[in-house]
Amino acid sequence: VGYSGRCFLSRSMSERSGNRGACSQPCRLTYDLVDESGRTVVKGRHLLSVRDLNLSDRIGELIDAGITSFKIEGRLKDVGYIKNVVSHYRQRIDRALASRPGFCRSSVGESRPDFQPDPSKSFTRGESEYFFDGRRAGVASFDTPKSVGEFVGRVARVDGRNFTLAGPHDLAPGDGI
């Protein structure tokens, strides 16, 4: 079908091209999986909802393979996501280039964000390197097409309509869980 950032399904199903910024996001819908005899094998799951591609740990290998330009997905994303992810990749690319004699940036200027970029802190459906090292499991998020967020804790106690979390992070008013 495709993978995050390169889809043809939207155009085929709705005449809206995801590759032109008008994705109808059919991959985020629920589907039933039916076998050849018509028996439903899986019902109402997000069977086409792939995780977000993240090869930031492989930037050096990609540069060594001859990649000279990186496309960073950002369609339908907010400015906070773009700022965070682009800054993250910029730091990774600069670090990789600095350790390779004979390589240099093709542009001038510097970017110095006033925060530590971390894609896991932005909207994410989970991450995958897809098939960078061959076929692997875990490229899809069958349970939800939404941001999976980060682990905040386990429910330690339930008291009527209230519950208590035990975990590694402090929560603040307005945090969504």
Question: Language-model segments: which ranges?
Answer:
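Surface-exposed amphipathic alpha-helical tracts and adjacent flexible/coil segments at the periphery
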Residues: 1-177
